[in-house]
Amino acid sequence: RLLNTADAQGAAQALALDAALTWTAVQVQAAPAVEVNGALDVRTLQASVVAAQMAGALSSVFQRSLQYANERQQFGRPIGKFQAIQHQLAVMSEHVFAARMAAQLGCSAGHDGMGVVPDRLRVATAKARCSEAALVVSELAHAIHGAIGFTEEYDLQLFTRRLHAWRQTAGSEAYWYGVAGEALLHHQGMTLDIVRRITDVDTVL
């Protein structure tokens, strides 16, 4: 069932970043049901959702870093005017948009008339790429922000800490690259066919 997080009751957790969410039995029964293929791998479904979350967080981290670089003054001008910072932002941009495209492919895995059925290979690509980007983007974001990015009062750490947690959720990039590699080893045709299977979709969300 599709449960609205806005309707949930939240409770703080001692060892987790996010609150524990609970719904009443009435809310659960009233929530719309989505029919899912019985053979669906739950980890694959979870990974597709987490990849989308990561893509959004990566974009937010990049936008915050870009804004900070344009506002922070050093030596009489914004630090974003320095070539070293521009290079870091360019690298971040590459990873952020690559992760976004991969997550879109993972979420557009298809519908067979029986419910949501993610394509495992597309999801593997999405989760692996987003997890890989999380390391690079988080590191560069904190490098650009300096010490302020590590403080509890500054919002950057709310995103980067979750990116590191989500990187391991439903399998890290090492796990999903292994899934993709296994699919490639068992494929009997051309490698290009695998690439087409991942990237050729009718509509990218």
What are these regions (language model features)?
Residues 48-205:
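Alpha-helical interface subdomain recognition
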Residues 1-63, 67, 191-205:
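FAD-binding core of flavoproteins
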